[in-house]
């Protein structure tokens, strides 16, 4: 069994139960899914770049991402409706806990000058979104084989009703926060 899933079941649930005094066990917040989105602006000029981004995201997440397309044309960006401009993947269940574990234990300590996340990144409903500027913080990415540095947006969707519950849940997984 995965360590973070076990951590949630054995420790985090009881800590949240004590902190917020829930009456029903179904009220206890949990992580529902993790969405990783990689926007590839260079794909407008060169369509082969999207394949490399898909490959990087496949290595990071462990499953094949969905290629996203532009919804409407924007002339100033030379963007046409239907052009491939990024990729995203939704992780649930065991892959979600596996990714979260690799993110907290391996990837975040490798980010330069990283002090933690701000509480302002919560959306008001307990969901947490942040960005990473480079994909090379993940050990699955071979630094010698990448063509360019790409960032990504990571959204952790929880069943928490408030930001305080969401922060408490994610702090249980040792996600570093400041202020």
Curated annotation (Swiss-Prot):
Pfam families noted in UniProt: Ribosomal_L5, Ribosomal_L5_C
Top-level taxonomic group: Bacteria
GO biological process, one term: translation
One GO MF term attached to the UniProt entry: tRNA binding
InterPro entries linked: Ribosomal_uL5 (IPR002132), Ribosomal_uL5_bac-type (IPR020930), Ribosomal_uL5_C (IPR031309), Ribosomal_uL5_dom_sf (IPR022803), Ribosomal_uL5_N (IPR031310)
UniProt keyword terms in alphabetical order: Ribonucleoprotein, Ribosomal protein, RNA-binding, rRNA-binding, tRNA-binding
A Gene Ontology term for the protein's cellular component: ribonucleoprotein complex
Cysteine disulfide links: none
Subunit-level organization: Part of the 50S ribosomal subunit; part of the 5S rRNA/L5/L18/L25 subcomplex. Contacts the 5S rRNA and the P site tRNA. Forms a bridge to the 30S subunit in the 70S ribosome.
Role of this protein: This is one of the proteins that bind and probably mediate the attachment of the 5S RNA into the large ribosomal subunit, where it forms part of the central protuberance. In the 70S ribosome it contacts protein S13 of the 30S subunit (bridge B1b), connecting the 2 subunits; this bridge is implicated in subunit movement. Contacts the P site tRNA; the 5S rRNA and some of its associated proteins might help stabilize positioning of ribosome-bound tRNAs.
Protein family: Belongs to the universal ribosomal protein uL5 family.
PANTHER family membership: 60S RIBOSOMAL PROTEIN L11-RELATED
Name of this chain's protein: Large ribosomal subunit protein uL5
Species annotation: Rickettsia bellii (strain OSU 85-389)
